[in-house]
């Protein structure tokens, strides 16, 4: 299958769900407790569009195992793919050989290739999971997640009734913890805003206006939604849709109709954001010198109750209940 077809198929799957499902009860493939899919042979986790593709397949088929591999990889592990099973396509990028006259300062040339992978539930005699199993969904993920958020150095202020990242002040604003129904609701909202935070010019410099024009806001929100899902899945935290998610996702349908590759682009940017946040956590765990702008949490603030949504005020409205 051409790689363009894979992008289009994934977009069509999500678009069909958006247009035919009950918006109030629709569960996107990136919501739930599924861990990040990993390759059974190498142990490496999949990235970008492949995560969404494999989550979609797992949701449709009811796969609970996060391990995937090609036919040959399963065979090398002593497992046999059953004849009746159908593969799921993923993309990988292969480096091409350089010409003798190539400029060594240029980036290495890559070409996209498709691979057929099967879930562990589709094979006979799969090996047992690795010694380090996927993290279980924590009943109270806040202590570990708070440490993760602190490691980013983001300025986080609590108070008011809005969840947003403000580029002008480079701060994240959240409602009080007591306003959220569950700890995972709080963690999901904070993860969403942290992904927005990574897009600042002095971080990942994520500017989607050239790529999406007037739909850049919807694309950025999709990046934050997917990035939050990746961050939480890596930490074994269940992702649950908030009550307003149907209205919140309404802008995605026009985006996907106009550009079938928008979902893939957003997934790639979301992976970069999640990796950026994880790298900051790893650096903090290595006890590197603290960066300027250490993490600050204010218990109560006078937030901008009179502010309206402007280009400098990116609002997610990800809270689950506000009192």
Regions found by a protein language model. Give the residues of each.
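N-terminal accessory/interface modules of nucleic-acid-binding and processing proteins
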Residues: 1-323
